[in-house]
């Protein structure tokens, strides 16, 4: 029986099967090269489009349709936010199709997909893989460097701010623990309470308060010091001053034998001679400490008697009891002047000697000798 003649359709199918076989062989050897084509051809740009047309085998071995375009945007969008890097999605069926010769179709089943087609293919059991482009890798490599450069000044600013906060906290803590000298802060409340507060007693020797209130302010301390000084000045002004008396016996100063007797109320019994330019006219004064600003003065003549000098000294010193006069300064010791009729010259009074007026006490006894 003769074999049936081939129809034109069977010839077309046989040629197409042979072409697919050859294409699969070529595709399996150059598969790695074909996958790198998008990486070598892609360049980093703000916006670019890529059209991928892949043959897709149908149930009857026909050529597949053209897939829609997949747009990949740059890493930085127009609004300033970073978008995920563009990727080329390729899908391969889990069960690859076989031709009439039971040979696999190779890369003919892989195709470029959009993000909308990925869920549909995953639901059908198709494996979906993403391949980043070269431009994407370049952008991703530059991003960490820029991020590091941006983090360095931010870190420096944050470090400086942390140091400032730490310094302020440390100063606040030290201000609470230590007292820092500075200008006095005067508040109006100090003027209102100045009459109510008790002033601190002041020691004028070193100008330090002996006892003060715990809540007293520097203003109250200064005010109390001022008032204490003011009171002391007023007390000195109100104290009666000692009268400076110049008792004269009516004799001229040029007369020879004139003697000056200075008497002090605090030590009324002592009289000391004071040398003058004229040896014939010795002057007498009280050598002891005095509370008066200036001692009382009395002038005597060398011819005045001892009784006259004693009576005058009693009047000046306000002596009411019995008294006696001593001559002090002799090499032999002090000498009692018992003769009131002799003169001072006859008594041997010379320069460097003293007269001592001794008063009897209330019991009628003389003070014991030194």
Curated annotation (Swiss-Prot):
Residues 298-370 are annotated as: Interaction with GGN. It is found in: Cytoplasm; Membrane; Golgi apparatus; Mitochondrion intermembrane space. InterPro entries: Ub_USP-typ. Residues 31-49 have a biased composition (Polar residues). Interacts with CCDC159. Interacts with isoform 1 and isoform 2 of GGN. The N-terminal domain is required for targeting to the mitochondrion. This is Gametogenetin-binding protein 1.
